[in-house]
UniProtKB/Swiss-Prot annotation:
Job description of the protein: Putative pheromone receptor implicated in the regulation of social as well as reproductive behavior.
Parts of the chain that traverse the membrane: 18-38, 51-71, 95-115, 136-156, 189-209, 240-260, 272-292
Organism whose genome encodes this protein: Rattus norvegicus
PANTHER family in UniProt: VOMERONASAL TYPE-1 RECEPTOR
Topology versus the membrane: Multi-pass membrane protein
Record-given protein name: Vomeronasal type-1 receptor 105
Amino acid sequence: MMNKNSRLYTDSNIRNTFFAEIGIGVSANSLLLLFNIFKLICGQRSRLTDLPIGLLSLINLLMLLMTAFIATDTFISWRGWDDIICKSLLYLYRTFRGLSLCTSCLLSVLQAIILSPRSSCLAKFKHKPSHHISCAILSLSVLYMFISSHLLVSIIATPNLTTNDFIHVTQWCSILPMSYLMQSMFSTLLAIRDVFLISLMVLSTWYMVALLCRHRKQTRHLQGTSLSPKASPEQRATRSILMLMSLFVLMSVFDSIVCSSRTMYLNDPISYSYQLFMVHIYATVSPFVFIVTEKHIVNSLRSMCVKVMNV
């Protein structure tokens, strides 16, 4: 049995911190998802980004729930899992992580489209129906599920196995070593996907920052520097997306650094625990970014609380 996990589930501080992070993330994403469902049921006017925001909260919620279940095999002495459970859980977890990346990228691009002026070539996409967004998300989902399909073959249950030839994921689940050709092919596909989506995020973020800076200069020129113009809903939404994308890129860099160090030191439980914690910060914090920065969400939640208190 691998030493790092046996040491991890005996450390109550690491275990409690990790499950506290998961609990906070599940609660926040559930709240944001329920708000979007409530908004849809009440027939309120939806924005172009409402569907991706609701979908992102659902994906993060499912990923965190899946993480909590998988973590029982990492931090808690648990009965053994068979191949089917290992393959299903880890494949779904990796799929949800990929979908979170795809949806975040789509959200960034859509917000750039919303903020674009009428003279921009992106303005024609503002009034596209929501089923175009659904098709884009579905296409990205199918593509990523195909890229991750090798996990259904390479993930196996490894009870009472101590060899270092396997990449241990949890106490009972490991990844079989692949041939150099297969490993290179899937690594290249994943690298192309990540570089493309993150580059698209960076470009759309840079475009939004440029538009916001230009708008601020124009507003100051028209109203004078003594006045502080009130931010429009589109600008507030853009700032929340910018915060979200900055957090995502930062967490991706940290995850890459920790993952590289874990590759160098396979039996180091400290780097493994850091990776477990860091990789889920984005899914935990992202709903708070929307809840805090979007005034209509805060006002709606406040009115709902008042109604509940008056019942």
